[in-house]
Design a protein with these regions (language model features):
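Accessory "access/gating" subregions that flank catalytic or transport cores
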Residues: 229-356, 372
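Glycine-/small-residue-rich beta-strand-loop submotif within the FAD-binding core of flavoenzymes
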Residues: 11-24, 68-98, 127, 131, ...
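Glycine-rich anion/phosphate-binding loop at the beta-strand->alpha-helix junction
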Residues: 145-155, 160, 298, 302, ...
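A structural-propensity feature for long, helix-poor, extended segments
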Residues: 86-116, 174-208, 278, 370-436
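FAD-binding glycine-rich core of flavoenzymes that anchor FAD
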Residues: 114-140
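N- or domain-start disorder-to-order transition segments that initiate the globular core
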Residues: 1-52
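FAD-binding core of FAD-dependent oxidoreductases
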Residues: 56-70, 74-78, 85-108, 136-160, ...
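Mobile "lid/hinge" segments at catalytic clefts and subdomain interfaces of large enzymes
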Residues: 151-260, 264, 405-416, 431-441, ...
Length: 451
């Protein structure tokens, strides 16, 4: 039986996002009452049009053209032209998982009922997701200041029967992809192009998948760290609960508890419990709970922010059917990607720290000046064989230290570059997983950005 989830704009989790992104058989549907809520929002838009109100992006142009009025008989043309003009991304296509995450998130935030879009348009987006019609979305072209306009426009193109889509591994014109899936393209009405392309779902979708990968990297780092401690004949005494209670950060306590569990009944530890002249281990061994725990704390906060973003209305203007006698249409700035960009900076730092301390443990394992009784570079035949001499150097190059400086502050006009940062973290996370496990990124989500 395929999995099924229901969306309502309020309760989507990161685990739901990963499931839909990585398992194309998962079916997504509206929760009861969701379509009625969207319809009420749409009725506010229709009422504003009937009354001749001036509404940004509905009866006016966009951006610098916001003061330009649009004739009533050209309102639909305005919306389709918006999608066509803004679908100008470049670079390799987003991965299938990233695309599916983005589609799910866009449908979910529209399901909140604050965007003034007809339910049938969002249903068609879900139909595409369920049928495996995946818009081809270039990775590059968004700076996050007004949301992810270019990527979301590429998504919307297929919805209207244009652009390109991947279906079953084959890239097709959007109209043909929809035809093969038995889906009718939609014709956008007033407000609907803007509702589809104004938001943060590109960076938030990638960020959600990267976070799930990072959570696995932490788990792998603790397994690798416990094995390193055994190999170096270290002691888990520094992980004692009393030490953790003296500095009660939740992540630190969780890491220490897991390390104690991994090292419980270790025969290697018992072999040198008595008569060992060493007083304490090196930082990279002794401080694992503090460093890994800081990463755990960071990931918990990032999860909270990304789950909030996954259930947030991020377009402009927003429609509030329950405000005032006839509802309100209000221009705001929920499209700005700074909340996501900021936590993605934190994710980059956390992953880089995990990779860095892991690389230092690798150095201690292979360096004959640091590795105690272990053979130089972990080879039985040093000289003829170099062992893991260069593996440590390679690990050093994979720590991400050269590409993790903050991206959220890189522009004085408040573009946050969160989308570019999400792409960089894909590299950082893959490198961190390689450093921690030596297994070609097996611990990470993998492929959150490019195929």
């Amino acid at each position: 039986m395929p999995h099924r989830i229901e969306i309502d704009g309020d309760t989507l989790t990161l685990d739901d996002i990963e499931l839909v992104a990585t398992d194309p058989s998962t079916q997504v549907a509206f929760a009861p009452g969701t379509e009625a809520r969207m319809q009420r929002s749409r009725e506010v838009v229709e009422r504003a049009l009937a009354e001749g109100a001036t509404v940004y992006g509905v009866t006016t142009g966009f951006g610098r053209l916001a003061e330009t009025p649009i004739a009533a008989d050209r309102l639909e043309e305005l919306q389709i032209n918006l999608i066509r003009s803004h679908a100008c991304g470049f670079g390799p296509p987003l991965s299938r998982a990233g695309t599916r995450a983005m589609m799910l998130l866009r449908a979910n935030v529209l399901a909140k009922g604050f965007s003034g879009i007809r339910p049938l348009v969002v249903q068609r987006l879900l139909d595409m997701l369920n049928a495996g019609v995946h818009p081809v979305i270039p990775e590059q072209g968004s700076v996050g200041a007004s949301g992810d306009l270019a990527p979301l426009s590429h998504l919307a193109l297929v919805l209207v029967g244009e652009g390109e889509a991947e279906v079953g591994g084959e890239v097709l014109p959007g109209a043909e992809a929809m035809r093969r899936a038995g889906l009718e393209p939609v014709r956008l009405q007033a407000k609907e192009g803007l509702a589809l392309n104004n938001g943060t779902q590109f960076m938030a979708g990638i960020g959600a998948l990267l976070l799930r990968g990072a959570e696995r990297v932490v788990e792998a780092a603790e397994v690798a760290g416990a094995m390193s401690l055994e190999g170096l004949m270290g002691t888990p005494d520094a992980f004692h609960p009393a030490i953790m209670r003296a500095r009660p950060h939740p992540g630190q306590a969780a890491s220490a508890e897991r390390l104690r569990g991994l090292l419980a009944d270790s025969e290697i530890r018992e072999s040198h419990r008595h008569g060992d002249p060493r007083v304490q281990d090196a930082y990279s061994i002794r401080c694992m709970p503090q460093v890994h725990g800081a990463a755990r704390n960071a990931l918990a906060y990032i999860r909270q922010v990304l789950e909030t973003e996954a259930n947030s209305a991020t377009d402009n203007p927003l429609i509030f059917p329950d405000e005032g006698a006839n509802g309100l249409v209000i221009s705001g700035g929920n499209f700005h990607g700074q909340p996501v960009a900021q936590v993605l900076d934190l994710l980059a730092i956390a992953l880089t720290d995990l990779a860095s301390i892991s690389e230092r443990r690798t150095e201690r394992l292979v360096n004959p000046d640091l590795s105690g009784d272990l053979p130089a570079f972990l080879t039985r035949d040093p000289g003829v064989c170099s062992g893991f001499m260069i593996a440590q150097v390679t690990a050093r190059g994979g720590t991400g230290t050269f590409i993790c400086p903050p991206a959220g502050w890189t522009s004085f006009d408040r573009r946050n570059s969160g989308t570019a940062l999400a792409q960089a973290i894909n590299t950082i996370e893959s490198g961190a997983a390689d450093v921690v496990t030596g297994a070609g990124g097996a611990a990470s989500a993998g492929g959150a950005v490019a195929e």
